[in-house]
Amino acid sequence: MVNNYIRDLSENRLISVKGTTNRTMSYNLTPKGIKEKMSLLISYNLETTSLYMDAKKEFAKRLQKIYEEGIHSAVLFGAGETAEIIYNASQSLKLEIIGIVDNDPAKQEKLFGNLIIKAPHCIEEIKPDGVIIASVGRQDEIYKQIEMLTAKGIAVKKIGSALNGLNGN
């Protein structure tokens, strides 16, 4: 299969192939191949940016819904890439992100936007109206970890994946 790809790339003059044995073979991009690589890279970057913007818009809608439910200040639980998108989406909304927590000690005490990442036990000290779980892959696990906050008047929301249907509580 790889040989078929190499043959196609060579026939389309995207690569040049030199050598006679597996040990002496070399594959180099031609000028046409370099142009094609740049074109593909630009297309990839445009698609990635478009996906980011779509996710940000979807998260903004969900954050607005959370705000309308009475949660005006929130802590994000999870300091990963999803949290970055959620945090950025919140900047143009009335919902105020007043803290961020993460279970990973390596992330704690580091800067996230204008906030310092704290350990989850700090949630009550921050005094949010709610906690938004910003980890798509571990939502249920995190929810179980902090669901006792609901008895203390702190709502816990699963924001879900921006690419799937709304998965909030």
For each of these PLM feature ranges, what is it?
Residues 1-14, 20-169:
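Hydrophobic, well-ordered beta-alpha structural blocks that scaffold small-molecule cofactor pockets
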